[in-house]
Design a protein with these regions (language model features):
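Active-site neighborhoods and metal-handling regions in enzymes and metal-associated proteins
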Residues: 1-393
Length: 393
């Protein structure tokens, strides 16, 4: 955690300070940025204020006086709530514009961490509380070109595992001993384990026919179906290397069990594929012109394409999400649907592009790639691109 770099950005953005607040390790974003461990007791509130200029300030409870000792700055203590309020007045001083892990109107839920009561308390002291979303994007969500190597390494193994899953399904089809959705899900998890990967206990999505019309369907022993000839198949799988700091890789592919997929299914796949292509081309064009581009703008391109093809009502989620140490990261999402993500896509941003079409009770189609913006401001796809349906027979 580099206080000086944070202060430089605060000055650039015209913000008086960044106030970190936590209780019971609720703010995982703040803990990561500050380099704090979640180990040990965390039963009392603490505050850490980084002003745009000057020395940082720590405010901790006397029951846990060493909670922020790894951080630079002057330390203040409190015990009761009245003293807490007085210390906050003293520490923060005259009314200021202060960033916190807060999102107006809960616009970006990933950032909406500080409780409403604490916001009320600080506003009552005369301060303007603004969102730290742009700061989080810069100091938590961007991935340097050393760390991104773990993403590429995981990607090769995940791609390999997907091919193995398709082959496992093919064996079942040819033998007449059909594999179930759940069996393929468990096969993927076992292969992840064997390869030193983890999905953080979130199982992959494996669904046939109408099952993936629920975009986040995942099979269980109770709801699982056999994967048989003429089935339409969707597999969404994600994993990272099982080591600290590793970055996720997350893809979705579609397949047909047979050699002659229905025309409607082919057409729907081509629509989502081309929406994905259009979104990437727009992003690359903007970056090539050295223009800024926000997550919501890229979503608009993919969404408009699907709407023009007549399936806008069936595209029921954002076009993509930030990726980091968690499969859903804390950076800019490709979203002007579930939220309007105004954050800029910057060098170091890693995210998915995954437009989809979901017809309830019938089928679901999605095509997902991961995109990284490197230090040269080039947007690159980090793995394979699916161009046609995989045919399994």
């Amino acid at each position: 955690m580099k206080v000086e770099k944070i202060q430089e950005k605060l000055v650039e953005l015209g913000i008086d300070g960044w106030l970190f607040y936590d209780f019971h390790n609720r703010d995982k974003i703040g803990l990561k940025i500050l380099g704090l461990s979640i180990q040990g007791l965390a039963t009392r509130r603490w505050f850490y204020f980084i002003p745009a200029n000057g020395e940082p300030i720590k405010l901790v409870h006397r029951v846990e006086p060493d909670k922020l000792d790894t951080l630079p700055g002057k330390k203040f203590f409190y015990s009761g709530w009245r003293e807490l309020h007085e210390r906050l007045k003293e520490i923060l001083g005259s009314p200021k514009k202060i960033a916190m892990q807060y999102s107006p109107m809960n616009a970006i839920p990933y950032i909406s961490i500080v409780d409403a009561g604490t916001i009320e308390l600080l506003r009552g002291l005369g301060h303007e509380i603004i969102s730290s979303a742009d700061l989080v994007q810069i100091f938590e969500a961007l991935i340097d070109e050393n760390l991104i190597k773990t993403h590429f390494e995981a990607g090769k193994l995940v791609d390999e595992t997907l091919d193995e899953a398709f082959e496992e399904i093919r064996k079942g089809v040819r033998s007449g001993k059909y594999k179930t959705e759940y069996e393929i899900q468990q096969f993927i998890l076992k292969r992840f384990y064997d390869k030193g990967l983890t999905s953080d206990e979130d199982p992959p999505i494996v669904g046939v026919n109408d099952h993936p019309s629920n975009p986040h369907f995942y099979p269980t022993p109770e709801n699982s179906r056999e994967i048989k000839p003429e089935d339409k198949l969707l597999i969404d799988l994600w994993a990272k290397k099982n080591e600290p700091g590793a970055i996720f890789y997350d893809i979705t592919w579609c397949a047909f069990i047979g050699d002659e997929p229905p025309e409607e299914y082919v057409n729907l796949f081509h629509i989502v594929r081309d929406a994905r292509r259009e979104a990437l081309a727009f992003l690359q064009n903007r970056l090539n012109q050295n223009l800024e581009v926000a997550g919501w703008e890229v979503d608009e391109v993919a969404r408009r394409y699907i709407q023009e093809k007549g399936y806008g009502d069936y595209f029921t989620h954002r076009t993509g999400h930030s990726i980091g140490e968690n499969v859903h990261g804390n950076g800019a999402n490709i979203d002007n649907f579930e939220t309007q993500d105004l954050r800029k896509l910057l060098p170091g941003s890693l995210f998915s592009l995954e437009p989809g079409i979901y017809i309830p009770g019938k089928l679901g189609v999605r095509s997902e790639v991961n995109v990284y913006i490197n230090s040269e401001k080039k947007a690159i796809i980090t793995g394979r691109e699916q161009e046609e349906l995989v045919l399994i027979y």
